A protein has these predicted regions:
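N-terminal, positively charged/glycine-rich alpha-helical extensions of SAM-dependent methyltransferases
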Residues: 24-52, 56
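A C-terminal cap/extension of S-adenosyl-L-methionine-dependent methyltransferases
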Residues: 52-55, 131, 206, 228-270
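Acceptor-substrate binding/catalytic loop of class I
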Residues: 208-225
Length: 270
């Protein structure tokens, strides 16, 4: 019986648990070519006009979805309190350069950002220091972190699930890291013809917003499939919203109905 997972946040990290003769052997493997390719982009994280421009454009929409639910679920007033998220422990898996970690820290949360690309962690740490933000960044996988048995009030799993080999295994790890009554956020890309046109042909080949090969359509996942994975891991879906690009305003907007390409799910552990 084998169980494996591929972590890829601008790089690939594989962890396989192989069972033979009632013993378990853990094998770790890093795809050097993938890591080198995306490590080359690491210094681009905070360049709003660079390779990560699409993510910078999407970030306000992601933050709106996250903070709306944090405010309601944990009864936090983001309009009055100076540090409304104080007391919350937040884990950002696949944190990259810290685009979500930094705003969460500014709101008062205790933030841990993890990534399997070491250069991403170095870039994120340097930028946080420059911004005078206290953020704990670690070069570690979610599996290795789980072995330390920490628990978090909130887990951010944004634009990462489409890069893992086994989404079911990955979501199960996330569930085990989440406190009871905690919240988990997962944004990814739907699997249909439109998502192929927009997320791959449009974004990577026509507009060249993303490097070619960033996404594999076969790893895209439908909202119904992702919701089932949450359910199977003991998580209850609270809300699903679409991230829709408005070409007239040249910005991203939240949608209650359009999940055809980019979407995000908020779930809780009961």
């Amino acid at each position: 019986r084998g169980l494996g997972d591929v972590y890829k946040r601008q790089g690939i990290y594989v962890v396989c648990h192989v069972y033979r003769n009632n013993s378990m052997k853990t094998v770790s493997s890093i795809n050097d070519e993938e890591v080198k390719k995306f490590e080359h982009l690491a210094n681009e994280w905070w360049n709003t006009e660079g390779k990560f421009k699409p993510l910078h454009m999407l970030n306000p929409c992601r933050l709106e979805f996250i903070t709306d639910h944090l405010s309601m679920h944990f009864k936090k007033d983001l309009t009055i309190d100076k540090k409304p998220l104080k007391g919350l422990k937040i884990l950002d898996i696949g944190c990259g350069g810290g685009l979500l970690c930094e705003p969460m820290a500014r709101l008062g949360a205790e933030v841990l950002g993890i990534d399997v690309v070491e250069k991403n962690i170095k870039v994120a740490s340097l930028h946080a220091k420059k911004m005078k933000l206290d953020i704990d960044y670690r070069h570690i996988s979610a599996e290795d972190l789980l072995r330390k048995k920490p628990k978090f009030d909130v887990i951010l799993n944004m634009e990462i699930v489409e890069h893992v080999e086994s989404p079911a295994f990955f979501i199960e790890i996330c569930s085990n890291l989440l406190k009871t009554r905690g919240l988990i956020f997962c944004s990814t890309i739907n699997k249909n013809f439109k998502s192929y046109l927009f997320a791959i042909l449009g974004a990577e080949y026509i507009m060249q917003w993303l490097p070619k090969g960033t996404h594999d359509w076969n790893k895209f996942i439908k909202p119904s499939e992702l919701s089932k994975l949450f359910f199977d891991s003991g998580l209850r879906v609270k809300d699903t919203k679409g991230f829709v690009f408005n070409p007239l305003a040249w910005s991203w907007e939240l949608s209650k109905r359009d999940f055809t390409v980019n979407y995000s799910i908020c779930a809780t552990k009961e």
